[in-house]
Every structure is written in structure tokens, then in C-alpha cells.
């Protein structure tokens, strides 16, 4: 699918932004003729709970004072459409919501902070968790979103405190023909919104995010693995910035959160784990199959596996559980990949899930049903195992563990236990092969590689890029796990590449500088010190 617009196309009528406005110029943002690097913090404003009234507990003016003192110059300010428009009365706008926004703009202006207004929760639903398909399937939702942005632009066209407008947070468009067609759908909506904004406002920056994933309209499956630069869509506008988010490695930054599939996990940074990005699945070879009717731990293994696809540069251990049933659970433990040379001599045995080593497996389900977690109920060699439960279609838990060297062969082995699995189910261990654009250990080089992908896109397109979100969850700062080192390395990597950034978030139960614990508002003092040491120039 070819997009109808290139990144090189500019607006037919470039405008003079004036000294007080931030605007895009080449690959930079500038203000008053000088380069402007965004150093921002997110304010979440309770958008995920879909509030109908302005949030009171998130922050007050003192938050802007505090951020300025730490060296921040901006806030990515999250919006939920419901503060400004009622579903029962579309296209009529609520002054309560705009009064709240006016108040925050005054607070920001008084403390030397600028705002990026970000539509985090648009009509049709929050995008990031994949529940916002109605934005893409119902044209009226898209029309309402464009109209709301037009109203915002009309009101704030002359407001220099506002840097610009983030059209949709982490879009996950649904294609009309297939998943990849979602790129066209997002491009058309982004252009529709931009055109509506430009009816009233020619001076503020438009922030266009790359897609988080694209969804197939027939199967509902999401393609998460488009090449990085193909995840961006161009718009016709000379004052646009292209936005990406990074939480690499996800298994570290999201550790301990059930909603992210990382419940019960603990990981440190830096580490010598392998993290593959831009991965494309190539093939699998079954190593051995477990019996569905047995509740004992069964040894599962197979013969030597040769990798035949020449594009393979990474291999994974995969625990597959297909069609086990809604009430069934299957477990796997003591999982290994044995590596052999060309003549069949054992080189080494690599642990994937053992008493001493706990791999960061990812879960996938063909129809979205079931779960893949770490269980403390059973274990073959300890009180821990992988657990897949409630899957009615194909599902697996996978760990990309090794870089592939041509000529090497592999054997996968481990133990599996079943509970209530259907007799027709497929429960197996297998070796999967992948091609990855990048394979890095969990170090500063990994973070820098993620940022350099965006830098390369900026050089190729000639447009500015912006890291709209990065952050480490609160569990990353426990027990010497290295959260402060991750944040420091991320900030320095972004600065090294000359890319503006925004930390997620000021007040948030999972990622906040402030969060709630036992009914009390807690500040992450370690994180605050990182900001004081590294945000200011």
C-alpha cells in the first residue's frame, strides 16, 4: 500500500510564527530564531477513567513550579474528549472543560512552562490497550474528533504558552482491507484533523504519532512489527513534528504490572539479556509434544533442530498451548536450549526458565483469549513456572534467547504439566526462528539504538522527531533494580541525538514521580534527583 503523501511535501502557505511561538524548521524546533529542545513531563489528568468532570487530585499550580525548578520547560498535557463534549450532545462544547484548560495554561505561563495538548482519549476510545476500534470504524467519531480539535485551535490560536497539538495518542488504526491499510486510515484522519486546525490556527506545531500497531478488520489481529520508519505517516503541513514513544526494554520498564503481562516479575538494569527489536517471525520446529491428560510433570524434548531460513539471526524457545479450553491451565518449567556445532557436539546449554534463571517470556493469543503468566502454584524445580490458561485458539509464550550463528543446531527441552486441557489440544515446546532489525543486551546501547532509529528517520525525512513518552514503572526503583540508571541513560541518549523528550508521568499509579500508596501521596525521591541532575543543561 502506497501512501499518497510524502514527508517532503510542505504546506502551500508557510506562515510567520513570530518570536513567541515554537515551530518546526527543518529537523529542529525553534523559538525566536534559536533551537528549542523539549524537556517535558506528562500530566495524566486521570484521562483513563474517562472523567466527565475536570480532575482535582492530579496537580495544582505548585506542580508547574516544581517542574520548572527541576529544569523542565514543558508539559505534555493529556486530554480526554469527554471533558469538552458529551456523547449525548455532540458538537456542543462544555465550558467547564475549557475553563479547566484555561486555568492550567495560566499556571504554566506563570512558571515558564509550555504545554503540548495531547488527545490521549479520543471519541471512539483509548487506543493504547487496543480497545478504541470505534474511532476507526465509525466515521462520526472521526468527524467529532476533527471538529473538537478545530474548536481547541480556534480558542488557543494566539496562545504562545501552547507548543502545539498531539492529534491522537498511540493510534492503533483498523484498516478497511487489511492490517497494513490502517496506515492509510490514520494518515487520512491525521490530515483531516490538521486541515480543520489550520482553518483557525497556522502557528502551532502539529504532533503526529507513529502507529502503535495496525489491526486487521477481518481477523481483529494486530500487526505490531512493521519496520520502524514505516510506522510513521506523513501529512501536508510545514509545521509538523513526528512523534515516537520508547519504553525499551518493555520487560524491565513494565515489571510487576499484571495489566502489562509482567505481574510477579523482577528485572534489573543493566543486564546481559538479549532484546530484539523490529522482529519478523520466520518459522518454527516442534521439539516435542505433551500429553493433554496427564497432571504429572512430563519431560518434553526432541532431536537436533537445524535452522534453514538464511534470514534467521535470532532463535527463541516457545511454549505452545493451542485450544486447551477456557477452564484449562498448562505449565512449563526447567526450560533449556542446548546449542550444538555443525558436527553435533554440544557447545553449551542456555537456561530459559529454571530455578536460577527466569526468562522474560511474552504471551500471544490468536483470538485474544486466555493469559500467559508466571505462576507460583507449581514448579518442577522450584515454586515457579510458566502458565498458559483459558486459551481456545492458538497461543504461546515465547522468549527470544539467542543470536543465531549459521551452522549451529539446537535442542529444546523442559517439563510440562496440564490441568483440564482438551484431548484435542496441542501442547508443545518448539524452537522459533526470527529476523530482528536489532539485537542488543540490556544496556545503554539498547536505549541508544531505539533513539537512533528515530534519528535516522528524521535524517531521511528531513522532519523533526520527538520522544513523546518514556518512563520506568515504580517497581524499577525497588531493591536496587536500576530504575534511576535507566532514566539517566535514556535522558542522555535522547540529548546525545538532539531529540526532545517527555517523561511519563508526573502523577500516576504505575509510572509517576508521585503515586498513591496506602492512601498517601508518595514522591519517588530517587527519580526526582535524577531529574535535578540531568534535565537542566
Predicted features, each with a name:
Residues 1-6:
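Bacterial N-terminal signal peptides
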Residues 11-74, 421, 441, 445, ...:
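N-terminal carbohydrate-binding accessory modules
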Residues 37-43, 73-79, 83, 114-118, ...:
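Structural recognition of the beta-strand scaffold that forms the well-ordered cores
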Residues 47-54, 81-99, 123-140, 173-179, ...:
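Surface-exposed, active-site-proximal loop segments in enzymatic domains
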Residues 56, 147-150, 154-157, 161-162, ...:
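Extracellular glycoside hydrolase catalytic/binding regions
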Residues 56-126, 144, 186-203, 207-209, ...:
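Aromatic-lined substrate-binding rim segments of carbohydrate-active enzymes
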Residues 276-441:
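Extracellular and organelle-lumenal recognition/adhesion modules and their flexible linkers in secreted
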Residues 284-285, 338, 360-370, 374-376, ...:
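Aromatic-rich peripheral "rim/lid" segments of glycoside hydrolase catalytic domains that contact
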Amino acid at each position: 500500500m502506497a501512501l499518497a503523501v510524502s514527508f517532503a511535501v510542505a504546506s502551500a502557505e508557510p506562515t510567520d510564527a513570530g518570536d513567541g511561538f515554537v515551530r518546526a524548521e527543518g529537523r529542529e524546533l525553534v523559538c525566536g530564531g534559536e533551537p528549542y529542545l523539549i524537556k517535558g513531563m506528562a500530566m495524566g489528568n486521570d484521562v483513563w477513567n474517562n472523567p466527565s468532570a475536570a480532575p482535582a487530585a492530579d496537580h495544582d499550580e505548585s506542580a508547574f513550579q516544581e517542574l520548572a525548578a527541576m529544569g523542565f520547560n514543558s508539559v505534555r498535557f493529556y486530554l480526554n474528549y469527554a471533558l469538552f463534549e458529551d456523547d449525548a450532545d455532540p458538537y456542543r462544547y462544555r465550558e467547564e472543560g475549557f475553563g479547566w484548560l484555561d486555568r492550567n495554561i495560566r499556571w504554566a505561563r506563570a512558571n515558564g512552562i509550555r504545554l503540548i495538548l495531547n488527545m490521549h482519549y479520543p471519541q471512539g476510545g483509548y487506543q493504547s490497550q487496543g480497545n478504541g476500534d470505534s474511532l476507526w470504524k465509525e466515521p462520526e467519531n472521526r468527524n467529532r474528533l476533527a471538529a473538537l480539535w478545530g474548536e481547541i485551535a480556534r480558542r488557543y490560536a494566539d496562545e504562545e504558552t501552547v507548543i502545539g497539538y498531539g492529534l491522537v495518542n498511540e493510534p492503533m488504526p483498523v484498516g478497511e482491507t487489511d492490517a497494513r491499510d490502517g496506515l492509510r486510515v490514520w494518515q487520512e484522519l491525521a490530515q483531516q484533523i490538521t486541515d480543520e486546525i489550520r482553518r483557525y490556527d497556522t502557528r502551532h506545531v502539529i504532533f503526529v504519532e507513529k502507529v502503535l500497531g495496525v489491526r486487521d478488520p477481518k481477523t481483529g489481529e494486530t500487526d505490531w512489527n512493521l519496520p520502524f520508519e514505516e510506522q510513521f505517516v506523513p501529512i501536508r503541513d510545514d509545521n509538523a513534528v513526528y512523534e515516537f514513544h520508547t519504553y525499551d526494554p518493555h520487560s524491565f520498564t513494565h515489571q510487576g504490572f499484571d495489566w502489562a503481562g509482567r505481574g510477579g516479575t523482577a528485572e534489573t538494569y543493566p543486564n546481559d539479556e538479549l532484546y530484539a527489536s523490529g522482529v519478523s517471525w520466520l518459522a518454527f520446529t516442534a521439539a516435542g509434544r505433551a500429553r493433554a491428560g496427564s497432571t504429572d510433570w512430563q519431560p518434553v524434548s526432541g532431536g537436533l533442530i537445524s535452522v534453514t531460513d538464511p534470514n534467521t539471526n535470532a532463535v527463541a524457545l516457545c511454549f505452545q498451548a493451542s485450544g486447551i479450553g477456557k477452564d484449562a491451565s498448562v505449565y512449563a518449567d526447567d526450560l533449556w536450549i542446548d546449542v550444538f556445532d555443525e558436527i553435533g557436539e554440544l557447545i553449551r546449554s542456555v537456561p530459559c526458565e529454571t530455578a536460577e534463571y527466569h526468562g522474560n517470556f511474552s504471551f500471544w493469543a490468536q483470538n485474544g483469549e486466555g493469559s500467559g503468566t508466571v505462576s507460583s502454584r507449581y514448579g518442577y524445580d522450584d515454586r515457579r513456572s510458566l502458565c498458559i490458561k483459558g486459551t481456545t485458539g492458538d497461543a504461546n509464550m515465547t522468549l527470544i534467547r539467542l543470536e543465531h550463528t549459521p551452522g549451529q543446531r539446537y535442542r529444546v527441552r523442559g517439563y510440562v504439566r496440564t490441568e483440564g486441557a482438551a484431548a484435542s489440544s496441542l501442547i508443545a515446546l518448539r524452537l522459533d526462528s526470527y529476523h530482528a532489525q536489532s539485537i542488543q543486551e540490556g544496556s545503554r546501547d539498547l536505549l541508544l539504538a531505539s533513539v537512533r532509529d528515530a534519528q535516522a528517520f528524521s535524517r531521511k525525512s528531513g522532519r523533526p522527531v520527538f520522544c513523546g513518552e518514556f518512563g520506568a514503572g515504580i517497581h524499577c526503583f525497588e531493591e536496587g533494580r536500576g530504575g534511576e540508571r535507566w532514566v539517566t541513560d535514556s535522558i542522555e541518549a535522547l540529548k546525545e541525538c538532539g531529540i526532545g523528550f517527555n517523561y511519563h508521568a508526573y502523577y500516576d499509579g504505575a509510572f509517576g514521580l508521585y503515586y498513591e500508596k496506602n492512601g498517601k501521596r508518595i514522591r519517588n525521591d530517587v527519580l526526582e534527583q535524577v531529574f535535578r541532575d540531568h534535565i537542566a543543561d
